[in-house]
UniProtKB/Swiss-Prot annotation:
Annotated catalysed reactions: L-cysteine + L-glutamate + ATP = gamma-L-glutamyl-L-cysteine + ADP + phosphate + H(+)
NCBIfam families, A to Z: gshA_cyan_rel (TIGR02050), PRK13515.1 (NF010039)
Function: ATP-dependent carboxylate-amine ligase which exhibits weak glutamate--cysteine ligase activity.
InterPro entries for the chain: GCL_type2/YbdK_subfam, GCS2, Gln_synth/guanido_kin_cat_dom, YbdK
SUPFAM superfamilies tied to this protein: Glutamine synthetase/guanido kinase
Name this polypeptide is given: Putative glutamate--cysteine ligase 2
Keywords annotated in UniProt: ATP-binding, Ligase, Nucleotide-binding
Gene Ontology molecular function, alphabetical: ATP binding; glutamate-cysteine ligase activity
E.C. numbers: 6.3.2.2
Length: 385
């Protein structure tokens, strides 16, 4: 079955990952608005794989199209190595977390580009304070109709992915009480959150065209749902996750997303169905995932009862179990065991803060974990070559 075989020439469910890193001053541990000083040099190395974001203390990278999670792992290691080494050559560091533990959005410079000036003009304070860092996973689709059908079903699993990825418990020096405060901040933007269901791709296009005609948006990329059909790449893009701190965590998430989509498609091919739940119900789980992460309970809508996030994660693994070997992603998905044992990034950050009482120690931990598994000799080689 070509749709479950990454080695098949027509395998559709390819992987692409975007990550947004923090640029850190290692002396103060504050964010550093420095992208303009390293962008030209970085793009000589990475070309279009490195981009600025609205705030100059953010650097965005994107992998090439990958067929397997192990290809994606090599790409993420290469990109983190390149950006990390480039930052180090300027006396800086990078870190991966959904928010910075204490830096203020009010002290960040905006990247000088009309696109970002336009966003700020429209969104005002909601845009200026959008100092958050995400991970987006793109999965290739066989066709547009299949993309919509998979999105309708996969919406149910978005809170599961958020709970696993939580890495933003702090905001401007305060414990927020949330495991993903990033997801709370992003709700200030329009056209965010769990997407609605669509009966067809034509209905989705009609929605986009209404927004364009009424000047609500000027392009389809300004629909920022937690999952969306990408307007240019032909992918289904999952946007709900905080950026993963460790490489292993990023690959775990990417492997899960790919496996979920392939399993849903497999059910379609066998004329089987999976119930499509309302946005109102899924939003209940999203809020719980943001608030409690893997330490709380989510709702099993089929049973109509609460289950621990750990138990629902076991159900998710059982759901994708018959496709992960074909996809070569069992080891990546099994990393969930390590997250359950040692905690999510958010849980580890909070534990470090509780043990040390020093929020700068949290930044140091994030810097270390971001580059964990990235060989320094490889990082240097990428930058110099």
């Amino acid at each position: 079955m070509e749709y479950r075989d990454p080695g098949h020439p027509h395998f559709p469910f390819t992987i692409g990952i975007e990550e947004e890193y923090q640029i850190i001053d290692p002396e103060t541990r504050e964010l550093k608005s420095y992208i303009t000083q390293i962008l030209d040099e970085g793009q000589l190395i990475l070309r279009e794989q490195m981009k600025p974001e609205m705030h100059q203390s953010i650097v965005e990278v994107g992998t090439h199209v990958c067929r397997t999670v192990e290809e994606a792992r090599a790409e993420i290691i290469r990109l983190r190595g390149a950006i990390g080494s480039l930052a180090a050559s300027k006396g800086l560091r990078i870190a991966a977390a959904g928010t910075h533990p204490f830096s203020s959005w009010q002290k960040q410079d905006i990247y000088p580009h009309e696109r970002y000036y336009g966003v700020i003009e429209e969104m005002q304070e909601a845009a200026r304070r959008l100092l958050i860092f995400g991970m987006h996973v793109h999965i290739g689709m066989p066709d547009n109709e299949t993309c919509i059908e998979i999105m309708n079903v996969a919406r149910y699993f978005l809170p599961h992915l958020l709970a696993l990825s939580t890495s933003s418990p702090f905001w401007m020096g305060r414990k927020t009480g949330f495991q993903s405060y990033r997801s709370i901040i992003f709700t200030n933007f329009p056209r965010t959150g769990i997407p609605d269901t669509f009966q067809s791709y034509a209905e989705f296009e009609q929605y986009i065209n209404i927004l364009l005609k009424t000047h609500s948006i000027d392009n389809g990329k300004k629909v920022w749902w937690d999952a969306r059909p990408h307007p240019m790449f032909g992918t289904l893009e999952v946007r709900i996750c905080d950026i993963a701190t460790k490489v292993d965590e990023a690959i775990m998430i990417a492997g899960l997303v790919q496996a979920i989509f392939v399993k849903i498609y497999s059910l379609f091919r066998q004329n089987q169905t999976f119930r499509v739940y309302s946005r109102a119900l899924i939003n209940e789980n999203k809020w719980r995932a943001a608030r409690y992460g893997m330490g709380g309970k989510l709702i099993d809508f089929g049973r109509r009862e609460e289950l621990s996030a750990h138990d629902l994660m076991a159900e998710l693994r059982e759901f994708v179990d018959d496709v992960v070997d074909d996809l070569g992603s069992r080891a990546a998905v099994d990393y969930i065991d390590q997250v359950l044992k040692h905690g999510t990034s958010a849980e580890r950050q909070l534990r470090t803060y509780e043990e040390t009482g020093d929020i700068k120690a949290v930044v140091d931990q994030l810097i270390r974990e971001t580059m964990e598994g990235v060989p320094l000799d490889q990082a240097t080689q990428v930058v110099s070559g």
